[in-house]
Amino acid sequence: MADSTADESTNADTLWRELHKVLPEIWYDGGGKDHCEIDEAIRILTCLRKIESKNPESDISPVEVPKEFICTLSNKIMIEPMLIASGQTFEKSYILEWLKHERTCPRTKQVLYHRFMIPNHLINEVIKEWCLIHNFDRPKTSDEVIDLFTGDLESLLQRISSPSSVEDQTEAAKELALKAKRFSSVCVYFVAKIPDSITRLLTPLSISEDSNPEFLENIVTALHIFSTSEKNKTLVAENPLVLPLLAKYMKQGTVLTRIHSAATVNSLSYTDSNKIIIGNSEVLKALIHVIEEGDSLATSEAFSALSNLCPVKEISEKAVSEGLIRAAIKKIKAGSNVSMLLSLLAFVSTQNHQTTEEMDNLGLIYDLFSILRNSNSLVNDENAVVIVYNICKSYKALQNVVLREEKRDVVLEEENKHGTFTRLENQEAGRATSLAKRILEWILR
């Protein structure tokens, strides 16, 4: 009896060695090129099942899952093996998530000529046989969200917050920004699942002298991308490091740093609960600085942020007191970002009529006349005439009769020389036509 058991043990060892020779051939040929190898694997597994059934005590020892049964994406035994164009097999839910973002095979790195996949029934049968022999409880399919690209986020953050060298820190920041840009799951996971992730990400910026522009660009870029996820907006805005650093880097740093800093504020400003937080911070003044001094892209982001914030009257009043009107008019006079800034000034002048005095003192009305004479945009026409109308309302309210008549004459002269408001009245272009008519009624009375 002892000899028989020993023989069976020897046979089992031999069979396992044979199986481990066959499995790689099946896997790396895609599991479907040679059915003889599949049949051989099933034959070996059937023999093993017979041997194991005579030695139930062997089931007690722990079982190591063959690496060929493990999906390289999930690092778990496959439940629904799927064959892709490269001939490689992966767990269904993981390869589906991978192919949402990638056009390459995770194992071979070759570019896939299509993203179709089919169930690998042959490999599935081999795994089922193995599980039966070892009484291995194969997991059921799950609706669990796949965090496929998040495995190295903690190590990247560690390299950023506790760097071994400046070069490695910069490279880690670059990798993090690229990951965040490519995979939406990374954005949510980084902020929600990694403890103190935003603080750890930004701490190097709060203690450094900004001597590494590339590192700074990548960190601010990553922060911008994290802020675009709806789930992250409040958590990011409420972090005490975020807004002071964004305010700082809207005023200094590279062009890209300024653009991404303004874009981050813009992204955060879409959430109502963030508006008061932003309005009460130094970010508001920094946005106005970007409007006045920034390039076109940064100005566009700052404009969008202010458009989100200024409907809150307290924030609008603060923005005006911080120099919004002067900054916007400076850009309009320079011919930069005219359309968006006209839109902003039209809103502000309607919301707060006291702003029209500053607009008038800065000579904006002459720029508006020029825009109305030369514009091919109905939107610009409407916004420009809204501002002119609001300025005229402030003229009409003047107590000094002489000054009031002088101001009226300025508008009348424009009409007499160029017929600006008559042309607008005849356009039948909605609000612009209506306001032009009112202006004409006042100046031609």
Curated annotation (Swiss-Prot):
<keyword id="KW-0808">Transferase</keyword>
<comment type="function">
    <text>Functions as an E3 ubiquitin ligase.</text>
</comment>
<keyword id="KW-0833">Ubl conjugation pathway</keyword>
<dbReference type="InterPro" id="IPR045210">
    <property type="entry name" value="RING-Ubox_PUB"/>
</dbReference>
<feature type="domain" description="U-box">
    <location>
        <begin position="64"/>
        <end position="137"/>
    </location>
</feature>
<dbReference type="InterPro" id="IPR016024">
    <property type="entry name" value="ARM-type_fold"/>
</dbReference>
<dbReference type="InterPro" id="IPR003613">
    <property type="entry name" value="Ubox_domain"/>
</dbReference>
<dbReference type="Pfam" id="PF04564">
    <property type="entry name" value="U-box"/>
</dbReference>
<dbReference type="InterPro" id="IPR013083">
    <property type="entry name" value="Znf_RING/FYVE/PHD"/>
</dbReference>
<comment type="pathway">
    <text>Protein modification; protein ubiquitination.</text>
</comment>
<dbReference type="GO" id="GO:0004842">
    <property type="term" value="F:ubiquitin-protein transferase activity"/>
</dbReference>
<dbReference type="InterPro" id="IPR011989">
    <property type="entry name" value="ARM-like"/>
</dbReference>
<protein>
    <recommendedName>
        <fullName>Putative U-box domain-containing protein 47</fullName>
        <ecNumber>2.3.2.27</ecNumber>
    </recommendedName>
</protein>
<dbReference type="GO" id="GO:0016567">
    <property type="term" value="P:protein ubiquitination"/>
</dbReference>
